[in-house]
């Protein structure tokens, strides 16, 4: 869907769950793509998190190429006080704003092609300018590699494992 929206000339916001603490229905690496009118595919957590994110997106809040947002927890970094997660849980999400003029659609096509052939890729995202590079990866261990304060986030995108009986 992200490729279609970009090809239609629409800006998209690609969101990736970076970390969770406590109760969370999605694990790190879960993704959602949205556009300015609030249309979206995928999920970050379910319910109130998506609702809050999409409300803020429609209001024009996410203007940077990439930013990490936090929901829940007791941290002062929680800029979403109206969203409380169960049992003191916390969720950190990478939000990437991508315009149709960027080379990002080519990266998405490459990613889709590799996934279709059973290969995994690592997306390396720079927080300062939102630059993204793709790298082959053999180890499918951690889906997200990021230390708070680091300017680089590595996200492993791999084909979904299937059990055939």
Identify the residue ranges that each predicted region occupies.
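Segments forming oxygen-rich coordination pockets for charged ligands
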Residues: 1-165
């Amino acid at each position: 869907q992200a490729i279609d929206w970009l090809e239609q000339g629409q800006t998209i916001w690609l969101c990736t769950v970076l970390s969770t603490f406590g109760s969370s229905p999605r694990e790190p690496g879960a993704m959602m793509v949205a556009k300015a009118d609030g249309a979206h595919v995928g999920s970050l957590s379910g319910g109130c998190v998506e609702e809050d994110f999409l409300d803020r997106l429609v209001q024009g809040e996410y203007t940077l190429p990439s930013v990490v947002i936090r929901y829940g927890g007791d941290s002062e970094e929680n800029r979403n006080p109206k969203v409380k997660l169960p049992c003191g849980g916390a969720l950190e999400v990478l939000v990437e704003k991508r315009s149709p003029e960027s080379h990002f659609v080519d990266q998405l096509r490459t990613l889709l092609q590799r996934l279709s052939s059973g290969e995994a890729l690592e997306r390396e995202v720079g927080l300062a300018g939102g630059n993204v590079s793709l790298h082959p990866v053999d180890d499918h261990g951690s889906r997200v590699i990021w230390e708070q304060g680091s300017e680089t986030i590595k996200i492993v995108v791999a084909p979904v494992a299937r059990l055939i009986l």
